[in-house]
């Protein structure tokens, strides 16, 4: 059984998807953007600041479900400029 997960502590989905789906004891988070959940504005002028906001958004969704980063098994990261990697 699948359950849609949504919290006001993370940005609302901007398309036809959910913040996360809970299924069979797993939580699958959708891709996250560096948006402020209150204003919808992009946070951060550089990759570090934007990545920090993305992690904050992920943490809000995880915590809403009683989870934390220690429960994360896999992350896929898309980086526009590989010079920002590392």
Task: Report residues per predicted region.
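Short, polar/acidic, helix-capping and beta-turn segments at strand->helix junctions
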Residues: 1-86
């Amino acid at each position: 059984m699948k359950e849609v997960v949504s919290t006001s502590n993370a940005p609302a989905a901007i398309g036809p998807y959910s913040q996360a789906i809970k299924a069979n004891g797993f939580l699958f988070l959708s891709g996250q953007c560096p948006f402020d959940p209150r204003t919808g504005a992009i946070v951060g002028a550089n990759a570090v600041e934007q990545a920090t906001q993305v992690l904050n958004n992920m943490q809000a969704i995880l915590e809403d479900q009683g989870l934390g980063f220690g429960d994360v098994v896999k992350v896929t990261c898309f980086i526009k400029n590989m010079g920002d990697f590392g």
